Protein backbone atom coordinates (compact mmCIF):
# COMPACT_ATOMS: atom_id res chain seq x y z
CA UNK A 1 0.00 0.00 0.00
CA UNK A 2 1.29 3.41 -0.97
CA UNK A 3 0.82 6.36 1.40
CA UNK A 4 0.41 9.90 0.13
CA UNK A 5 0.01 13.16 2.01
CA UNK A 6 -1.71 15.93 0.07
CA UNK A 7 -1.08 19.19 1.89
CA UNK A 8 -2.43 22.59 0.92
CA UNK A 9 0.41 25.09 1.19
CA UNK A 10 4.17 24.90 1.09
CA UNK A 11 6.48 23.89 3.88
CA UNK A 12 9.34 26.38 3.67
CA UNK A 13 12.98 25.48 4.21
CA UNK A 14 13.77 25.29 7.89
CA UNK A 15 13.45 23.05 10.91
CA UNK A 16 9.87 21.94 10.16
CA UNK A 17 10.80 20.75 6.66
CA UNK A 18 13.91 19.00 7.98
CA UNK A 19 11.93 17.21 10.69
CA UNK A 20 9.17 16.26 8.23
CA UNK A 21 11.74 14.82 5.83
CA UNK A 22 13.44 12.92 8.64
CA UNK A 23 10.20 11.14 9.61
CA UNK A 24 9.34 10.46 5.95
CA UNK A 25 12.75 8.88 5.34
CA UNK A 26 12.54 6.83 8.54
CA UNK A 27 9.15 5.51 7.47
CA UNK A 28 10.44 4.58 4.00
CA UNK A 29 13.23 2.49 5.51
CA UNK A 30 10.93 0.60 7.87
CA UNK A 31 7.69 0.74 5.86
CA UNK A 32 9.02 -1.22 2.89
CA UNK A 33 9.83 -4.13 5.22
CA UNK A 34 6.19 -4.04 6.37
CA UNK A 35 4.64 -4.12 2.90
CA UNK A 36 4.17 -0.38 2.39
CA UNK A 37 5.33 0.93 -0.99
CA UNK A 38 6.52 4.32 0.15
CA UNK A 39 5.33 7.61 1.54
CA UNK A 40 5.14 10.72 -0.62
CA UNK A 41 4.13 14.29 0.14
CA UNK A 42 2.55 16.46 -2.56
CA UNK A 43 1.96 20.13 -1.93
CA UNK A 44 -1.23 21.69 -3.29
CA UNK A 45 -1.05 25.37 -4.20
CA UNK A 46 -3.14 27.62 -1.99
CA UNK A 47 -6.05 29.13 -3.89
CA UNK A 48 -5.92 32.86 -4.60
CA UNK A 49 -9.72 33.21 -4.76
CA UNK A 50 -11.14 36.11 -2.76
CA UNK A 51 -13.86 34.24 -0.87
CA UNK A 52 -13.30 31.28 1.47
CA UNK A 53 -15.89 28.97 -0.19
CA UNK A 54 -14.27 29.52 -3.59
CA UNK A 55 -10.80 28.90 -2.13
CA UNK A 56 -11.95 25.66 -0.50
CA UNK A 57 -13.64 24.53 -3.74
CA UNK A 58 -10.51 25.19 -5.83
CA UNK A 59 -8.28 23.41 -3.33
CA UNK A 60 -10.71 20.46 -3.11
CA UNK A 61 -10.69 20.09 -6.91
CA UNK A 62 -6.88 20.02 -6.92
CA UNK A 63 -6.90 17.43 -4.12
CA UNK A 64 -9.50 15.14 -5.74
CA UNK A 65 -7.53 15.22 -9.02
CA UNK A 66 -4.66 13.46 -7.20
CA UNK A 67 -6.70 10.75 -5.46
CA UNK A 68 -6.42 7.47 -7.39
CA UNK A 69 -9.36 5.08 -7.74
CA UNK A 70 -9.65 2.61 -4.89
CA UNK A 71 -7.60 4.70 -2.47
CA UNK A 72 -8.75 5.37 1.07
CA UNK A 73 -9.18 9.07 1.82
CA UNK A 74 -8.28 10.31 5.31
CA UNK A 75 -8.83 13.96 6.20
CA UNK A 76 -7.09 15.84 9.00
CA UNK A 77 -9.75 18.01 10.57
CA UNK A 78 -10.33 19.53 14.00
CA UNK A 79 -13.78 17.86 14.02
CA UNK A 80 -12.26 14.46 13.27
CA UNK A 81 -11.77 11.45 15.49
CA UNK A 82 -8.84 11.56 17.88
CA UNK A 83 -7.06 8.22 17.46
CA UNK A 84 -4.39 6.91 19.77
CA UNK A 85 -1.15 5.79 18.15
CA UNK A 86 -1.88 2.06 18.53
CA UNK A 87 -5.38 2.44 17.06
CA UNK A 88 -3.95 4.42 14.14
CA UNK A 89 -1.29 1.75 13.57
CA UNK A 90 -3.93 -0.98 13.67
CA UNK A 91 -6.04 0.87 11.08
CA UNK A 92 -3.09 1.31 8.72
CA UNK A 93 -2.26 -2.36 9.19
CA UNK A 94 -5.85 -3.39 8.35
CA UNK A 95 -5.88 -1.33 5.16
CA UNK A 96 -2.52 -2.81 4.17
CA UNK A 97 -3.75 -6.34 4.88
CA UNK A 98 -6.94 -5.66 2.88
CA UNK A 99 -4.64 -4.71 -0.01
CA UNK A 100 -6.00 -1.20 -0.31
CA UNK A 101 -3.86 0.29 -3.10
CA UNK A 102 -3.26 3.55 -1.29
CA UNK A 103 -4.12 5.73 1.65
CA UNK A 104 -4.33 9.45 0.96
CA UNK A 105 -4.04 11.85 3.91
CA UNK A 106 -5.37 15.36 3.27
CA UNK A 107 -4.27 18.46 5.18
CA UNK A 108 -6.37 21.49 4.30
CA UNK A 109 -5.39 25.11 4.02
CA UNK A 110 -6.21 28.05 6.25
CA UNK A 111 -9.94 27.84 5.47
CA UNK A 112 -10.16 24.12 6.12
CA UNK A 113 -11.62 21.48 3.82
CA UNK A 114 -14.73 21.69 1.68
CA UNK A 115 -17.57 19.80 3.43
CA UNK A 116 -18.12 17.64 0.31
CA UNK A 117 -14.48 16.56 0.47
CA UNK A 118 -14.74 15.76 4.18
CA UNK A 119 -17.79 13.57 3.46
CA UNK A 120 -15.79 11.50 0.94
CA UNK A 121 -13.29 10.53 3.62
CA UNK A 122 -13.28 7.01 5.03
CA UNK A 123 -11.73 8.48 8.18
CA UNK A 124 -11.47 11.99 9.54
CA UNK A 125 -8.71 12.40 12.13
CA UNK A 126 -7.78 15.16 14.52
CA UNK A 127 -4.82 15.83 16.76
CA UNK A 128 -7.10 16.95 19.58
CA UNK A 129 -9.51 19.85 19.83
CA UNK A 130 -6.93 22.54 19.12
CA UNK A 131 -6.43 24.13 15.73
CA UNK A 132 -2.87 23.56 14.48
CA UNK A 133 -0.91 25.31 11.72
CA UNK A 134 -0.71 23.10 8.63
CA UNK A 135 3.09 22.97 8.94
CA UNK A 136 2.83 21.41 12.40
CA UNK A 137 0.06 19.04 11.32
CA UNK A 138 2.28 17.76 8.52
CA UNK A 139 5.15 17.04 10.91
CA UNK A 140 2.81 15.47 13.49
CA UNK A 141 1.17 13.27 10.83
CA UNK A 142 4.52 12.10 9.49
CA UNK A 143 5.65 11.28 13.02
CA UNK A 144 2.46 9.31 13.68
CA UNK A 145 2.83 7.39 10.41
CA UNK A 146 6.42 6.52 11.36
CA UNK A 147 5.29 5.60 14.88
CA UNK A 148 2.55 3.38 13.40
CA UNK A 149 5.18 1.53 11.38
CA UNK A 150 7.31 1.00 14.49
CA UNK A 151 4.27 -0.35 16.35
CA UNK A 152 3.47 -2.75 13.49
CA UNK A 153 7.13 -3.86 13.42
CA UNK A 154 7.42 -4.30 17.19
CA UNK A 155 10.19 -1.69 17.23
CA UNK A 156 10.92 -0.06 20.63
CA UNK A 157 10.36 3.55 19.40
CA UNK A 158 6.80 3.43 20.78
CA UNK A 159 7.07 2.68 24.49
CA UNK A 160 3.56 3.53 25.74
Swiss-Prot record:
GO terms for molecular function: rRNA (pseudouridine-N3-)-methyltransferase activity. It is found in: Cytoplasm. Signal peptide: none annotated. It comes from the Bacteria. Its main location: cytoplasm. Gene3D superfamilies: 3.40.1280.10. One of its GO terms (cellular component) is cytoplasm. It holds the Pfam family SPOUT_MTase. It catalyses: pseudouridine(1915) in 23S rRNA + S-adenosyl-L-methionine = N(3)-methylpseudouridine(1915) in 23S rRNA + S-adenosyl-L-homocysteine + H(+). Its EC number is 2.1.1.177. S-adenosyl-L-methionine binds at residues 76, 108. Keywords: Cytoplasm, Methyltransferase, rRNA processing, S-adenosyl-L-methionine, Transferase. Homodimer. Specifically methylates the pseudouridine at position 1915 (m3Psi1915) in 23S rRNA. Belongs to the RNA methyltransferase RlmH family. HAMAP family: 23SrRNA_methyltr_H. This is Ribosomal RNA large subunit methyltransferase H. It comes from Rhodopseudomonas palustris (strain ATCC BAA-98 / CGA009). The gene is rlmH.
Amino acid sequence: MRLLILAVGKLKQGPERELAERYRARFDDLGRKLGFRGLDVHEIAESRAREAPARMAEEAAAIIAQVPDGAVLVTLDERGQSLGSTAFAAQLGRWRDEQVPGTIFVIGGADGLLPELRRKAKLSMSFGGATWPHQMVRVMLLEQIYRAATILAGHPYHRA
